[in-house]
Amino acid sequence: MEVRFKISNFSKCLLAVLCFLIGITEGRESYIAVESYSGKIVLELNADKRRPVASLTKIATAMVVLDWAKLSGTSMAEIAIVPQGTSLIGGFNPMGLIPGDRISLREAMYSMLLGSDNVAAATLADHAGRSIQSRSGGLSPEAAFVTEMNNLARGLGMQQTRFVNSHGMDGSRSQGISTARDMARLAIYAMRNPGFQFYVKQTVRTISSFRFNQKRSFKVRNTHAMI
């Protein structure tokens, strides 16, 4: 099932309309358009129908990382190591990251949000999760991070949402679930964060990682068709 996410800003007062299209096949659409500052719903269809959340998961991943970095005083220049097991995730990996590569949190965020990079998402979750892990009762870094994603969802009133990983790829036994209405709540929260706004508004970015002390540079282009 294909999932698409659209955000656009219009008018002099920067009124943001957030539209979510989930399941583009006939008869299976779900969408909602919301004025982000007033909360007024402009239109909706099947907005409470639960659907696989797929790559929209990365919005929650980004916000948990940004909130954690702010609360912990962690610099986004801090270096993370790509964890073991990421080669099994599948899907987008535009930088060709492999376990052991080193990348800053900032560069990983760019690759995740602009290039829908699943390995970058897992790397961010692993790095932040190791800090969160100390108060999570023995969970793995990824599991501790996903717990925070679901805590964020509950805090935003996303009652029909369940995240199962940091990247949105379906697992063999589970998949993340949400609704257009719930994702609107998350997107409004994200777009009110200046850091998140800055990342997603970039059209192209040259980013770097390190492998065996050799710098590897890439241009990551925004996969959002409206940018």
Which residues are covered by each model-predicted region?
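Non-catalytic cell-wall polysaccharide-engagement segments
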Residues: 2, 148, 152, 223
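Domain-terminus/edge residues, biased toward the C-terminal soluble/receptor-binding domains
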Residues: 162, 174-182, 187-227
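Alpha-helical structural motif
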Residues: 13-14, 145, 192, 219
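Bacterial N-terminal signal peptides that target proteins for export
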Residues: 2-14
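Bacterial N-terminal signal peptides
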Residues: 12-22
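Active-site-adjacent loops and short helices of periplasmic peptidoglycan-processing enzymes
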Residues: 22-181, 191
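Intrinsically disordered, low-complexity regions enriched in small/polar residues
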Residues: 7, 22, 33, 39, ...
